[in-house]
Amino acid sequence: MFTPRGFKFAGVHCKIKRKRKDLGIIFSEVPCVAAGVFTTNVVKAAPVIYDMEILKKNPNGIKAVVVNSGVANACTGEQGMINARRMAEKTAEELGVPVESVLVSSTGVIGVQLPMDKVENGIEEAARVLSNDPLPFAEAIMTTDTKVKMHSTKVMIDGKEITVLGIAKGSGMIHPNMATMLSFITTDAKISEEALKKLLKLSVDDSYNMIDVDGDTSTNDMVIVLANGLAGNTTIQPETDGFWKLYEAVHEVNQVLAEKIVEDGEGATKVMEVHVINAPDIKSARLIARSIVSSNLVKTAIYGEDANWGRVIAAAGYSGATFDPEKLDLFFESEAGRIKVAENGQGVSFDEEEAKKILSEKKIRIILDMKQGKETAKAWGCDLTEKYVEINGRYRT
């Protein structure tokens, strides 16, 4: 795993959770240009509200992010805002940085106040054990996740080697437009605030906003990107060659992390990748792809290895996109093969046993050819199983 210049990480167990690490810090030796994308849920957790304000005031001076897991600090009223600010203050004190240079994030159970004595002790410990290793931080932000989610890459811009590292968490309450997922992207690229905001928005639209586990949109989601400029490249501006090179690197990281989140979906046994091709416009393609991966009937059909193609067509139909349903061709595909199940909006004769064999694989592709244009979109989701109900039925116990 590559680590960008000037960044350090820590993850500790401060006893919010029974056993696993539950508090982490990312620290940059120099101020970062920062940008964020946050939950679309009207009910926003205190850290989300706090960070949105900080990024308005100080987008060019961020030095740290502090994250706790186990308690979401959502639906916690005025005390929740006080606690979010106190997390930033304590982190600033321990790191010797301005309070307005610290972002805050929380994930876990909604409606519970943070145990601030434990949190503050955890911040003290984390500040003492900062290192170049991002793994402890990745472990500290997990909730129902079964595995850490990290990815890094390098790119050459202006003759300078630039590193991008992403660390994410997410397993349940994942739905298009950002849900119970946190993602922190660090890079040593030098980039303007305007360019970073644009780059992040473009990437999120085609990565985290195109995944679904269970259709629930969380109160706490955020994607934060920090760029500290220590690579020494010329400052990247929007729409330049350097911009697109960095975009490709950041987007690779975001797409890999988005897929890792889906693969780790609560109770999931299969991943489905929906390809909408030859759509009339990009908006329609995205709407339809999202609708299909979000459909519980499609998810359960995939789990049951049932080629119930009508559920896919129906999900496209209620997506909000306008199209001609009599032109749709539909295919199921996996490493075991490919089969056409519908043509021009109607079912075709196919071998049910062959279809079941294709759907028995761990990764399933659903390909909807609209034959009405040239635009394409991809979305990722997972099946819906009894295990999901079991995990979420006992989440607070």
UniProtKB/Swiss-Prot annotation:
Catalytic residues as annotated in Swiss-Prot or TrEMBL: T180 (nucleophile)
Domain of life: Bacteria
Main location: cytoplasm
Enzyme Commission number(s) from the entry: 2.3.1.35, 2.3.1.1
Location of this chain's protein in the cell: Cytoplasm
Pathway listed: Amino-acid biosynthesis; L-arginine biosynthesis; L-ornithine and N-acetyl-L-glutamate from L-glutamate and N(2)-acetyl-L-ornithine (cyclic): step 1/1; Amino-acid biosynthesis; L-arginine biosynthesis; N(2)-acetyl-L-ornithine from L-glutamate: step 1/4
Binding site for substrate: T143, K169, T180, E266, N392, T397
Keywords, comma-separated and alphabetical: Acyltransferase, Amino-acid biosynthesis, Arginine biosynthesis, Autocatalytic cleavage, Cytoplasm, Multifunctional enzyme, Transferase
Residues the record marks as site: Cleavage: A179, T180
Pfam families on file: ArgJ
GO molecular function terms attached to this record: glutamate N-acetyltransferase activity; L-glutamate N-acetyltransferase activity
GO CC field: cytoplasm
The reaction(s) this protein catalyses: N(2)-acetyl-L-ornithine + L-glutamate = N-acetyl-L-glutamate + L-ornithine; L-glutamate + acetyl-CoA = N-acetyl-L-glutamate + CoA + H(+)
InterPro entries in alphabetical order: Arg_biosynth_ArgJ, ArgJ-like_dom_sf, ArgJ_beta_C
Membrane-spanning intervals of the chain: none
GO terms classed as biological process: L-arginine biosynthetic process; ornithine biosynthetic process
Site positions (Involved in the stabilization of negative charge on the oxyanion by the formation of the oxyanion hole): T107, G108
Subunit annotation: Heterotetramer of two alpha and two beta chains.
The family this protein is said to belong to: Belongs to the ArgJ family.
Function recorded in the entry: Catalyzes two activities which are involved in the cyclic version of arginine biosynthesis: the synthesis of N-acetylglutamate from glutamate and acetyl-CoA as the acetyl donor, and of ornithine by transacetylation between N(2)-acetylornithine and glutamate.
UniProt protein name: Arginine biosynthesis bifunctional protein ArgJ
Organism for this UniProt entry: Thermotoga maritima (strain ATCC 43589 / DSM 3109 / JCM 10099 / NBRC 100826 / MSB8)
GN (gene name): argJ
